[in-house]
Amino acid sequence: MRTDEVIHYICAMQISVIILNYNVCYFLELCVLSVQKALENIESEIIVVDNNSSDDSCAMMKRRFPEVSLIENKTNAGFPKGNNIGVAQSKGEYVCILNPDTVVAEDTFEKILAFAESKTNLGIVGCKLIDGTGNFLPECKRGVPTPFVAFTKVTGLYKVFPKSRRFGKYYAEHLEENQTGKVDILVGAFMVMKRDLYLEVGGFDENCFMYSDDIDLSYMVLKAGRSNYYFHESVVVHYKGESTVRDGLYMKRFRDAMHFFYSKHFKKSILFDVFMSIGAFLFSLFKKSQAVTIKRKIDRYSLFSTDKNLVLKVENLLGKKVVMTDSTVENSLNSLTNKAGENIEIIFDNNQLSFKSIINSLERFRNKGFTFKILPQKSDFIIGSNSSNDRGEVIALKIDKV
């Protein structure tokens, strides 16, 4: 091997992380911070594509992350085109399509890349996604939405028969939440694949409707003869998740998305029209009124930090007693769990706790009466979401920057 080839091999960029943003400035700051931590030991780049946000996203990026590539679109180009623009500018062997309302652990990309390198004929790798309460998001592994599979989705039959292989194909129930294996469809919130493969299949189809862009890309990769994988050992927080609001607009968008997918990849299906018509009828007949997300009244706050000044600032802001906790997260949460009936909000200080430990805590202590927020390192806000349905909550602070 020539010297120049050796240098190229050593210095070759392994991965480009593409983050498409639109008006989620605070989530974006948290996301980029976590990605930077996860890429510290990897030859890599971060490319943020902003779809003409009206908030302070671009100003924040230039101030906080001047070393990160920022592409400022003059219009909202949409999800497919925005990501395609980012990939076109990338130089990594792999690309990661990542939503801005996500948090990755420090070892996320090391694990994902090691897994990817272990596979032949690799397509796309997705990871395990949880929401801001630690609950599993089933859309991170799915099957090809044939007319019948789409029917089980819109009618909710997959919920009635959660263990059925026949009715559970939409969410790939052949794999457990904590089981790695092949799947057909992965979610656009987190996708890792070879850049060459992304370009080979044409990237995201810019004609796609909402809810079909990631399905289409995943299926194009399958048609190219590659295998897609769900990798459960990497857990990523996706705050907003797939909306569970099942209103008329959702039904229309889902139907349009499936129609686009079938028209592109299959012959015209009478079954599709029949199943979607029945599904729409049952949907309108049996749908329950969507419960309004009620903000929980927090009984007390627990701040995982040793910063006494921070405790005082949070107390003054919230107007409630804040308990400072500086012991191990797991032991402290176990003791808090024993006090049943209280609504306890946990605030994790990322200046002292790793993203990995925070993510582990979210997952381990889900559904135990806690809500969670994160204070990102050297940031002046606390952020989180108590439901994959809502827009999240940001609590602004005034904290002296280091």
Where do the PLM segments sit?
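Short, well-formed alpha-helical segments that are part of the catalytic scaffolds
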Residues: 19, 24-39
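A conserved acidic beta->alpha catalytic loop
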Residues: 34, 50-59, 75
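Glycine-rich, basic loop-to-helix element that forms the pyrophosphate-binding segment
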Residues: 72-90, 111
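Short aromatic/hydrophobic "clamp" motif used to bind/position activated sugar donors
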Residues: 95
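Conserved donor NDP-sugar-binding/catalytic core segment of glycosyltransferases
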Residues: 103-139
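Short, flexible, basic/aromatic active-site loop/helix in glycosyltransferases
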Residues: 144-183
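A short, conserved alpha-helix in the catalytic core of glycosyltransferases
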Residues: 176-179, 184-234, 362-363
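Active-site-adjacent helix/loop segment of glycosyltransferases
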Residues: 219, 223-293
